[in-house]
């Protein structure tokens, strides 16, 4: 079936090779392996937590110096020095840093919604632009069949 415990195998044979598929070079892999390679990515990272805290500080009118320190800690780790540090951060800089730091980690959609840029995304199909209801997902038919008290989210066809 491809499932092993709580993990999902890429192929039933476990035959995953360095050359297979698209691969982000963000995480290195053991080049001595010829198969059964691990290619997991992290769900939460310290950098993500720092950036979330910095965002919360800015959104709540908190300590900008602390928010700036947190973002710069992420940048210093990424660049290896303080040459790219910010003097001060705002939501736009934090959103940009999240794009750099968390690329390929499944944060983009929710980040764009939270920062109010989802409907402006250049990859969004023209027929969906300006339809704010698409910021939330529809309730699935399966969920509704389980609980018929659910009402479909606005903008989507009713059950």
Predicted regions and their residues:
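Secondary-structure transition/capping residues
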Residues: 10, 58, 65, 81-85, ...
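Compositionally biased, intrinsically disordered low-complexity regions
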Residues: 4-7, 16, 23, 63, ...
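Flexible, polar/acidic helix-loop-strand segments at domain edges
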Residues: 1, 6-7, 11-46
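Extended, hydrophobic/aromatic-rich amphipathic alpha-helical segments that build helical scaffolds
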Residues: 41-74, 91-103
């Amino acid at each position: 079936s491809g499932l092993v415990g709580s993990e999902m195998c890429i192929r039933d044979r476990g035959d995953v090779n360095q050359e297979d598929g698209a691969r982000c070079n963000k995480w290195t892999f053991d080049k001595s392996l010829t198969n059964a390679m691990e290619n997991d990515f992290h769900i939460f990272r310290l950098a993500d937590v720092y950036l979330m805290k910095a965002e919360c500080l800015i959104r709540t009118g908190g300590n900008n110096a602390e928010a700036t320190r947190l973002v710069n800690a992420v940048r210093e780790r990424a660049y290896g020095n303080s040459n790219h540090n910010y003097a001060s951060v705002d939501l736009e800089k934090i959103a940009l840093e999240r794009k750099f730091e968390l690329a390929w980690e499944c944060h983009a959609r929710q980040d764009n919604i939270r920062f109010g840029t989802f409907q402006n995304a250049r990859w969004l199909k023209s027929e969906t632009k300006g339809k704010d209801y698409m910021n939330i997902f529809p309730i699935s038919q399966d969920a509704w069949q389980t609980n018929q008290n659910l009402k479909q989210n606005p903008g989507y066809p009713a059950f």
